[in-house]
Amino acid sequence: MAEQPESFALLGSIRSVETIARGRGVRARRHLAGKFGGRNWRKMKGVALIEDEDGWIGDAEIHWFEAHGVGRVRWKIKRRFTD
């Protein structure tokens, strides 16, 4: 079951999804496997419309980890896009 982000809410779908690292390239893979299970971890990034805990609404680049059978975990906002 996928963990939901704690510090922000997704208001739309995630676009421009890219894989940053996979397998041994994911530095936190041992921690992730120990806490959530799964084997084939990938670090991902994408852009989504979000609302953060301060009430700000807009597009932001977000990063997360995912594995087959586990889902998406450990979400982070990396960059906010302002007009």
Model regions and ranges:
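Cysteine-centric segments in proteins
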Residues: M1-D83
